[in-house]
Amino acid sequence: MKKIFVINGGQHFAHSGGKFNKTISNWDQEFFTDENGFELKYTDINENYNLMEEVEKFVWADIVVYHTPVWWFGLPYKFKQYLDTVFTAGHRNGIYYSDGRKLENPEINYGTGGSLHGRQYMLTTTWNAPETAFTLPGEFFNETSVDDGVMFGFHRMNAFTGMKKLDG
């Protein structure tokens, strides 16, 4: 059975109720069942969580699925806080050991000290921007994809831990 860890990064704040990302996360919970050949663990960043239990979920998972809105061209602050605190707790506890560099030559191998090799992740983002804002010449994002633009750092963060992006 594939072990799936789903994280709902949709945050309740102001006029954003986080309902759409909650709905997407609920669809995952309906699909990733034992009957379909999956084991599932789930976190909603709006609920209380234990840092070491969250670290253990990352270590346990074969695939991590992140669902998040994009606010002001980045992650909602509670989701960013979740990642910062969980990944920090995961230092030498299964998420990453070091930044990968060695004393003999500290100029190379930065970002290779992750402990989650062999695992994959998938990122879904929700926007108020139309697809054409990314694809049409002269539009706001200058023909730069979400992955190569706004979410580039997010993808590098996952690479730092050793995870690879799931194709699709």
Predicted region positions:
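Glycine-rich phosphate/pyrophosphate-binding loop and the adjoining helix
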Residues: 20-29, 140-168
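Flexible, glycine-rich phosphate/dinucleotide-binding loops
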Residues: 13-14, 49, 130
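N-terminal beta1-alpha1 ligand-phosphate binding loop
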Residues: 2-35
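Glycine-rich phosphate/diphosphate-binding loops that line cofactor/substrate pockets in enzymes
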Residues: 1-3, 57-58
